């Protein structure tokens, strides 16, 4: 919204933090009433908790503890932002238990990424303005680098679901969304994200070739071949 200071940052952050705080009230109540909603120890949970403790100490001992905790309107990060993300992590980990529940969560996130990608597509077609000016797509983020990072996560989520499903129509849908988001990633012109995506593909392909068998392994080999041959073809042409 244009009425906010740094509208692409503050609006999303205030909305996220308010929603997390409301969810936290419901979650704490549910955790007291029903044991299944209480956090369970895991390697990831312990690692994240240690990280939060270290960041808390770093905040207190920083040059400006006030700014380290509250950050600024330009970024809206700081330790207060980490605390909300940590709370979100605890709520998700305590609420979603089964693979089906996690699948629904990630599919909801993918649906949102499709809407964001179509926004970028309309920018590419000249139907919507690019907020930064120039030609780098930024969609609803107002920043091409943020959009690229967002798409980076969802591209790998799409790869995961593509490899795990055996239904042709699902694979076709995942593949179509993957191509859409890959095009938008390219037109963000964010070199770091694009190189990171290529490096991630190589690493994922190597791991799948080593650890998987059957169809997944064949897809991994095909992907590795494409990563090598496509840049080579551009170079030769």
Regions found by a protein language model. Give the residues of each.
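Alpha-helical transmembrane segments of multi-pass inner-membrane proteins
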Residues: 1-2, 17-29, 47-65, 78-237
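Short, hydrophobic transmembrane alpha-helix segments
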Residues: 2-14, 31-38, 165-166
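Membrane-interfacial interhelical loops
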Residues: 6-7, 63-73
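Interfacial loop-to-helix junctions that mark the boundaries of transmembrane helices
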Residues: 7-16, 38-44, 73-76, 141
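Extended hydrophobic/aromatic-rich secondary-structure runs
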Residues: 33-48, 64
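Short gly/ser-rich anion-binding loops that grip negatively charged ligand groups
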Residues: 43, 69, 82
């Amino acid at each position: 919204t244009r009425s906010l200071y740094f509208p692409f940052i503050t609006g999303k952050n205030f909305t996220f933090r308010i929603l997390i705080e409301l969810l936290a009230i419901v979650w704490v109540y549910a955790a007291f009433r029903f044991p299944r909603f209480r956090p369970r120890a895991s390697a990831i949970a312990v690692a994240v908790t240690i990280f939060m403790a270290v960041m808390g100490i770093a905040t207190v001992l920083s040059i400006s503890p006030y700014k380290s905790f509250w950050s600024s309107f330009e970024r809206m990060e700081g330790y207060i932002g980490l605390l909300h993300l940590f709370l979100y992590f605890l709520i998700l980990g305590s609420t979603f238990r089964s693979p089906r529940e996690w699948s629904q969560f990630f599919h909801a996130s993918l649906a949102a990424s499709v809407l964001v990608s179509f926004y970028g597509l309309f920018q590419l077609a000249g139907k919507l303005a690019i907020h930064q000016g120039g030609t780098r797509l930024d969609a609803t983020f107002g920043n091409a680098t943020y959009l690229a990072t967002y798409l980076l996560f969802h591209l790998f989520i799409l790869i995961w679901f593509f490899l795990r499903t055996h239904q042709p129509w699902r694979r076709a849908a995942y593949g179509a969304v993957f191509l859409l988001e890959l095009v938008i990633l390219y037109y963000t012109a964010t070199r770091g994200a694009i190189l990171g995506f290529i490096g991630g593909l190589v690493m994922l392909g190597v791991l799948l070739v080593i650890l998987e068998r059957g169809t997944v392994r064949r897809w991994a080999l095909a992907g590795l071949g494409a990563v090598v041959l496509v840049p080579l073809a551009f170079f030769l042409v």
